[in-house]
Amino acid sequence: MQVTETLSAGLKRGFTVTVPAGELESKRTARLKELGQSMNLPGFRPGKVPLSIVKQRYGDAVQGEVLEQAVSDATRALMDERGLRPAMQPRVDLVAGAEPGGKADLEFKVEVELLPDIAQPDLSTLSLTRLKATPDAETIDKALKDIASRQRDFETIEDVRPAAQGDVVVVDFVGKVDGVAFEGGTAQDVNVELGGAGFIPGFAEQIEGMSPGEEKVITVTFPADYSAENLAGKEATFDITAKALKRPVDVEIDDEMAKKIGFEGLEQVRELITRQVEQEYEQLSRLRIKRELLDALAEKTDFEAPQGMVEAEFAQIWQRVEADRKAGELDEEDKEKDEDTLRADYRKIAERRVKLGLLLAEIGRANAITVSQDEMLQAIRAEAMRYPGQEQQVFEFFRKNPQAAESLRGPIFENKVVDYVIELATVEDKDVTPEELAEIPPADL
């Protein structure tokens, strides 16, 4: 094999590789002989078919197979011999030697973008702040009120009067699109709480003021991201019949309420809520310190990012941006930007992500951080639990799709590296309010 370097610019390298025709011919002949050993033809003993006949039948297929293997082997040898670490799959273009008959040397070009050399930062110099919040009585009381509101009963309002905020209107309705009733759009004795949530925007608002016995036609527009795709974004009418009014009856927050929902008493409910809130605060605290850590590491990414990786990351980000724009969910700040500015901003985010990913990977590699089989199994089990009754199918999916399993490995590895770095850093605990803990930093990770 002969190799000539044709490009060396930044992280990009280019080579011309030549594999002698004789070497290819030897591999072709060996492969044809191998096929001949198992070939059966009338008039010939098993394994005794002449090579010329084997070549006539399988020559083109073997030619392609040998060329593909030769290119793969030569490219891998090139990378190994020169100690090159590709950032992505090398690009290969055949120049000569791919013609049927295979009499010429095989010549092809290889273009590859390399991973940068990354210096190990001194992680012990990092200073981080761990935000800590404690559940207060107000938070626990609010959670108890939310539980009580879900347990409340309703009593019928005997007076015939227009429905007002806070009332529950019992209605029958028939929904139509373009004058035709649609599936799932007809129901009887539905409770609509005025001022509550759970209905299409504008639905409950137009029922306010109706009295029992009154009929009305209202018009609403389904949200663009509505779960039923055949209705998403469409205008619909609903024939409404108000049948009765009810008012909610508050439930006392006491031991009796606790027993109704399966607890021994109110104190047990308080303890459970407190543990749940503490876990929520711990998760928020970890997200905040992880963000602070990544911001600190981003300042140490003074190396070039492989542009192929940046482009691939940007493509994924931009796909989500386009989906948000189509659904009308682009945030207000992005809505005000022109296309070029928006692309430039998200390209910077893509480059930051690639650099941080490479730095974390290098820290993990240098410190022998790996993801164990047990950790992978736990991740797959957690994923399977999201699909009750289909756990076995989920396990089979990951067994047959190693790339899908790798998508679970990445976050586990990243979190292990983050934990490792936090252990080495100087961490100061800081007490904050729940509101301060919940503040969301700009989403540029």
From Swiss-Prot:
Name this polypeptide is given: Trigger factor
Function: Involved in protein export. Acts as a chaperone by maintaining the newly synthesized protein in an open conformation. Functions as a peptidyl-prolyl cis-trans isomerase.
Subcellular location: Cytoplasm
Catalytic activity: [protein]-peptidylproline (omega=180) = [protein]-peptidylproline (omega=0)
EC number: 5.2.1.8
GO biological process: 'de novo' cotranslational protein folding; cell division; chaperone-mediated protein folding; protein transport; protein unfolding
Keywords, in A-Z order: Cell cycle, Cell division, Chaperone, Cytoplasm, Isomerase, Rotamase
Free-text note on domains in this protein's UniProt record: Consists of 3 domains; the N-terminus binds the ribosome, the middle domain has PPIase activity, while the C-terminus has intrinsic chaperone activity on its own.
PROSITE patterns for the chain: FKBP_PPIASE
GO cellular component, one term: cytoplasm
